[in-house]
C-alpha cells in the first residue's frame, strides 16, 4: 500500500511541476510578445507623420501628400477591410504551375511566368500569391512601361516590384536599380524581387504587408512604399485569388500596438 501511495504522490508532484512549467512558459511568451510592441497606435501615427517621412495618397487620378486623417485611417487595424494585409506572407502555399498561369493568362509580360513565380516561392519562401499580386499591382497588370523592360545598352531591364522606383521618377530609378541587379529577363526580375523582399523585410521581422508598409516596431522607418493604401491594394488582389482557389488564410496577426 505504501508503495502505491508513493507512486501516486510522485505522479502528483510531477503533474504539478508540469502545470507550473506550462504556466511559466505561457507567461514568458506573453511577456516576450508584449516586449515586441514599442508604441501605442497614436504614438505610431505621430511618428509616421514626423519629419522625413513620406505618405502619399491617390486623389483624382494623381498622387498627393496624405493628410493625418488619411494616414490614421490607413493605419487603423480595426477597420472593416479584409485581413490579408495582416497575414504572414513569409510562408509557402501549395499551388500548381497551371493555377498560377491561369491568373497570369492575360497579364502582359507576366503571362506564362508561373514557373518563375513558383521557383521564387520555393527558393526564398515568399508566398507565391503575394508575389503575383504585388507584381500585378506594381506593373499595371503586367503592362506598364517599367514592367515591359527599359532598354539600355541594347539590353532590357525589368522591375516587377517597384524596388528602387522612387515616386518622383519611378521609371528611371526603377530601371537603374534593375540594371544594377542585372535583371535582364522577367524571370530574373521575379527571382530577384523575391530575394530582395526576403532579405530586406522578412529578415527584419516585417512579415505581413501591413508590417512592410507601416513597420509598427519602428514607425516611419524602413517602409516599402509611400502610398498609404499600398498594403490594402495588394491584399485586395490576393483576396480574389484566395477566395477563388479556396486557400486557407493562415497566421493573421493585428496585435501590433501597446
Language model feature labels by segment:
Residues 138:
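Pyridoxal 5′-phosphate
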Residues 2-129, 141-258:
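Catalytic cores of secreted/periplasmic lytic hydrolases that degrade extracellular macromolecules
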Amino acid at each position: 500500500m505504501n508503495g502505491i501511495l508513493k507512486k501516486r504522490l510522485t505522479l502528483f508532484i510531477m503533474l504539478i511541476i508540469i502545470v507550473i512549467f506550462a504556466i511559466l512558459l505561457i507567461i514568458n511568451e506573453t511577456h516576450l510578445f508584449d516586449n515586441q510592441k514599442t508604441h501605442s497606435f497614436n504614438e505610431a501615427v505621430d511618428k509616421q507623420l514626423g519629419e522625413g517621412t513620406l505618405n502619399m495618397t491617390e486623389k483624382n487620378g494623381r498622387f498627393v501628400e496624405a493628410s493625418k486623417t488619411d494616414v490614421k485611417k490607413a493605419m487603423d487595424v480595426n477597420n472593416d477591410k479584409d485581413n490579408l494585409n495582416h497575414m504572414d506572407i513569409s510562408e509557402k502555399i501549395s499551388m500548381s504551375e497551371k493555377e498560377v498561369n491561369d491568373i497570369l493568362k492575360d497579364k502582359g509580360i507576366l503571362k506564362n511566368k508561373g514557373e518563375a513565380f513558383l521557383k521564387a516561392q520555393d527558393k526564398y519562401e515568399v508566398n507565391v500569391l503575394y508575389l503575383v499580386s504585388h507584381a500585378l499591382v506594381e506593373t499595371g497588370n503586367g503592362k506598364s512601361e517599367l514592367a515591359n523592360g527599359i532598354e539600355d545598352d541594347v539590353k532590357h531591364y525589368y522591375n516587377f516590384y517597384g524596388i528602387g522606383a522612387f515616386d518622383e521618377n519611378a521609371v528611371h530609378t526603377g530601371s537603374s536599380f534593375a540594371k544594377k541587379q542585372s535583371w535582364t529577363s522577367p524571370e530574373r526580375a521575379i527571382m530577384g524581387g523575391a530575394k530582395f523582399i526576403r532579405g530586406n523585410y522578412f529578415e527584419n521581422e516585417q512579415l505581413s504587408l501591413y508590417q512592410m508598409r507601416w513597420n509598427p516596431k519602428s514607425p516611419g522607418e524602413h517602409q516599402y512604399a509611400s502610398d498609404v493604401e499600398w498594403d490594402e491594394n495588394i491584399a485586395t488582389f490576393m483576396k480574389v485569388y484566395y477566395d477563388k482557389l479556396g486557400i486557407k488564410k493562415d497566421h493573421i496577426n493585428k496585435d501590433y500596438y501597446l
